[in-house]
Amino acid sequence: DYNVRCYYRDGKWGEIEVSQSPTIDLNIAASALQYGQEIFEGLKAFRRKDGKVSVFRMEANARRIHDSAEGLCMVPVPEELFCKMVEMAVKLNKRFIPPYGTGASLYIRPLEIGITPSIGVRTATEYVFIVMVSPVGSYFKGGFTTNNICILREYDRVAPKGMGRFKTGGNYAAGMKSGQHAHDLGYASVLFLDPKEKKYLDECGPANFFAIKDGVYITPASESILPSVTNNSIMQLCRDSGIKVEERHITVDELSDVQEAGACGVKYVISADGKPGPVSTELYHKLRRIQLGEEEDVHGWNTMIDGI
């Protein structure tokens, strides 16, 4: 029904606006359209077992979009403003929050774009920050089941020391051709290799890659990978459970030695490559229980939304 907006003009953020329009008035020479000054986030609100509503790791997403803004020479959205607008968007659209027990959630998409018109290559001086929402089910049609992943060596997602660690639309556009190729071959996603040597595992489609090797949770350490809030959460759950965590380079050849593997991200938590193993399964369900209020949130990851 509603989205919320805030404009940055004359060196400051203005008042929050509530809109029912799905469109914005944008100059065709805006920096977002001409030169890609656009960043976004993705997080979820859940209807919990107790009937209350919570948003998972809102502050972490606020910090990440701040980093993305700095990476694209944009004016960062203050964390307080980010959180306030997310909460407003959830409250205004409360009728779209799926019921507890359905496996669905309310997906929240914060978006910041440069709106200053300029044909010359320069950073914008004016921006708009928008928060929109949509009810969603599982990202992959199979949910937490088998989703086969392939390596396509002829494609790179990002350049070394490039923009891969920021959440900007260009990175996703760069993966569309390879993703289409993978789908045509019968796979759900592409596991990219590092763009420099084509030796180490990198991003896994729109998500982080992980594997379980001899009881150790391993995930690639790469400056071209978007730092996943979900992966960060899973690694913390591993440490809480006494599972060793290693963030390091993982070679392609090492894949033959792992017992479990898959992708993790906000949209589907964990998607196993092949048959889900016991460690992946427990981590998936543990994180879901925390999100749904079925298990104690010892790290304070959930923000409760009052009044709904």
Question: What is the role of each PLM region?
Answer:
Residues 1-89, 111, 118-308:
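Helix-start/capping segments and mature chain N-termini
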Residues 98-113:
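Extended, Lys/Arg-enriched charged tracts that mediate electrostatic binding to polyanionic substrates
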